[in-house]
A protein has these predicted regions:
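Active/binding-pocket-proximal capping segment
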Residues: 272, 395-402
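Amphipathic alpha-helices that form helix-helix packing interfaces
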Residues: 39-42, 124, 128-131, 135-138, ...
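Long, amphipathic alpha-helical stalk/connector segments used for oligomerization, subunit docking
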Residues: 303-389, 395
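Glycine-rich anion/phosphate-binding loop at the beta-strand->alpha-helix junction
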Residues: 175, 226, 233-327, 331-332
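Short beta-alpha connecting loops at secondary-structure transitions
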Residues: 20-24, 69-71, 279-299, 321-336, ...
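Glycine-rich cofactor-pocket loops
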Residues: 140-162, 272-288, 321-328, 353-373
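Short, well-ordered beta-strand elements within core beta-sheets of diverse protein domains
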Residues: 163, 242-250, 377-385
Length: 477
């Protein structure tokens, strides 16, 4: 840990080493060299005077980057791409004359950005699939556990703990669907020159249009992509960055919603996130068990959601074929968005894997409210016993108000059942009334909906991503 210079908390505290490496300079510069090799191979295969010996020399030094030479050169020329062209040429004297031939800086810069974002999205997908797997297992485990539902954070018709978890799961599934679409449509910039017209290649290939048309598809294939964007200015459209950032923001929104619910449930003592034996909740209040993981999910999620504005504004404000006011913003917003969402997903995995449910507390809260919710059934039973529906409705309203006063003003337990049993209009005993107090009578189809969702919606998706399953997350602090 550095103490004499600023280090982003996203890398020091929150993101995994795997995600951190994807956005490192080392990943970037190694990808530059792969792109230069792909370009040289393509040009050789299409007839330019490039030898196999030159290609082999480039491949021999694809990984052992002479960073010291590149740094010293950049101090002199103030241009990162040309500094690395020079450094590569120092290692490859036979090939130095054909490195970066016909290309502009964006050939390596923008294609690398696409490759890096693609790799980062793959890691996001992997972790997202595992969050969905953990959540669906939790939902299935607690599909029959009745619990109070809340609308406006006021007690409402009961649901189950598992059914509530399906709501969180479904939001992450929508994110996965969006992510898969964007991943499936990622394309490279290709090599189109300074303004996207491929003018330099017209010169190199003596105006042979048919040959030039083969350049981008060949580069894409060599770099593991299906195709390149058909048209561009100097850069790929910054709309691509916007789409990627929106995917991250969507996942962040889903995580934030889940974390909020967990925080509220922890306040009610119905559900708790994992709490380690040596963990300290408060420096002053030693008894505290704060939901700090869920709070951190919410905190980082807000950052990612707001960060999505950066690529959108950058895309909107680009001039003509390109302006450089995208560069500094991209260097911050895209990598940090990925670091933050990586930390969020690790936290989600950790929290969901260790969620603790307290059925007795849930039952206590349920039974405090269930008499109110059972009044319609009670009224129907009383009508069947000979009562008048309208009169009974009015009596239930009056008795409910009286019971509510007992709970809120006097701080006593809900005595609605006792009040109804004592009212001759209902002709029902307390024993009869208590028979209607089984919470499972009031959860509707929550269990069946959960089973169907897990079996028919989630499991087929997990089965199609089996190779991604099995991730366990560790959090640093």
């Amino acid at each position: 840990m550095s103490t004499d210079r600023y280090v982003s908390p996203l890398s020091e505290r929150y993101a995994s080493k795997e995600m951190q490496y994807i956005i490192t300079p080392d990943m970037k510069f190694r990808t530059w060299r792969k792109l230069w090799i792909a370009l040289a191979e393509t040009e050789k295969e299409l007839g330019l005077n490039i030898t196999q010996e030159q290609i082999d020399e480039l491949k021999a030094h694809a990984e052992d980057i002479n960073y010291d030479v590149a740094r010293e050169r950049e101090r002199q020329v103030r241009h990162d791409v040309m500094s690395h062209v020079y450094a590569y040429g120092v290692q490859c004297p036979k090939a130095k004359g054909i490195i970066h031939l016909g290309a502009t800086s964006c050939y390596v810069g923008d294609n690398t950005d696409i490759i890096v974002m693609t790799e980062a999205l793959k890691l996001v997908r992997k972790k997202l699939v595992n969050v969905i797997a953990e959540l669906s297992a939790f939902a299935d485990k607690y599909k029959e556990q009745p619990t109070l539902a809340f609308t406006h954070f006021q007690p409402a018709q009961p649901t189950t703990v598992g059914k509530r978890a399906t709501l969180w799961t479904q939001e992450f599934l929508l994110d996965l669907e969006d992510l898969e679409y964007v991943l499936g449509t990622m394309k490279l910039l290709g090599s189109k020159g300074t303004t996207g017209t491929q003018a330099s290649f017209l010169e190199l290939f003596d105006g042979d249009q048919e040959t030039i048309d083969k350049i981008d598809p060949m580069i894409a294939k060599k770099m593991g992509f299906k195709e390149c964007y058909p048209v561009s200015g100097q850069t790929y459209s910054r709309k691509v960055d916007t789409r990627v950032a929106n995917i991250l923001a969507g996942i962040a929104a889903s995580a934030h919603k889940m974390s909020n619910d967990i925080r509220l449930l922890q306040h009610l003592k119905e559900v708790e996130e994992p709490f380690e034996k040596s963990q300290i909740g408060s420096s002053a209040m030693a008894y505290k068990r704060n939901p700090m993981r869920s709070e951190r999910i919410a905190s980082l999620s807000r950052y990612v959601m707001v960060d999505a504005l950066n690529p959108a504004i950058t895309s909107a404000t680009q001039w003509f074929e390109r302006t450089l006011d995208d560069s500094a913003n991209k260097r911050l917003s895209i990598p940090e968005g990925f670091l933050a969402i990586d930390g969020i997903l690790d936290l989600c995995l950790n929290v969901v894997d260790g969620l603790v449910v307290y059925p007795k507390v849930i039952e206590k809260h349920m039974m405090a409210e269930l008499p109110f919710m059972a009044t319609e059934n009670i009224m129907m039973d009383a009508v069947k016993a000979g009562g008048d529906r309208q009169e009974l409705h009015e009596r239930i309203r009056e008795l409910s108000m009286e019971a509510g006063k007992t709970v809120k003003v006097e701080g006593k337990d809900n005595n609605l059942l006792e009040l109804i049993a004592a009212d001759p209009a209902f002709n029902l005993s307390l024993e009869d009334l208590q028979k209607s107090m089984d919470p499972k009578k009031y959860i509707g189809r929550a269990k069946e909906q959960t089973e169907r969702f897990v079996n028919e919606v989630v499991r087929p998706i997990l089965n199609s991503h089996k190779e991604l399953l099995g991730v366990k997350a560790e959090i640093n602090v």
